[in-house]
Amino acid sequence: AYANFVKIAMEEFGDKVKYWFTFNEPIVEPEQQFLHGVWYPYQKDFKQSINVQYNITLAHCLAVANFRKLKAEGKLCEGAKIGMINCFAPPYTKENPTPEDLEAVRMTDGLHNRWWLDVVAHGHLPQDVLDTVENDWKVEINRRPGDEAILAQGKVDWLGFNYYQPTRVQAPDSKFDENGLPCISKPYIWPERKMNVYRGWEIYPKGIYDFGMKIKKECPDLPFFISENGMGVEGEEKYMDENGTVQDDYRIEFVRDHLEWIAKA
């Protein structure tokens, strides 16, 4: 259905729209709805989460395939490009990690970051992540004959990189929960962290550099740009002066510190 929607949209607006993106932050729905259970339907079900994530991935790949076909037929603007935008979060752990802590980092990175990077840059999913999910955790991903050919079509022209916060993890207390579903990690509280208390998000400007360099190293042929980065603050009227100007020096500092790290990449 989504692939058909994309095809119709491109046929209607292909002569006007030059830059297309299949999804913005496709990781959010499977994580928030089914992994963490904080959005409707408020379920904590890793199997459901990974299969929703897998189906969104296929939808992305089919959308890219439709774009390529229409472009080859001359139905899109000259120089038209297609990409994906995702919120990436570089994972970190303790200063002296155990092998179990490093495994939590690997799978957190694999499911949240590398899953999407491998598809958009290389046209496949990370095999080590699939092996862990299906062989070690015994969670079935509903893969069908022909899916690999669909995934191979998922490579994009460029990537949008949203960055707000890192992910800090350590080994979970147990490998499986009371329902027999895998526990990927548990949060690690870095003693030196600086927080945006209004969002509950850590402010870590170096993370935008670390992940940008990861993209350059692992996907050297994939152009990317910073598509989102900023600081959300609730109730900013309390920082408003007598002239009606919000004195948001905290936001200026946030943007400045991130730009300094971007300049080093």
Q: Which residues does each predicted region cover?
A:
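Active-site region of glycoside hydrolase catalytic domains
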Residues: A1-A265
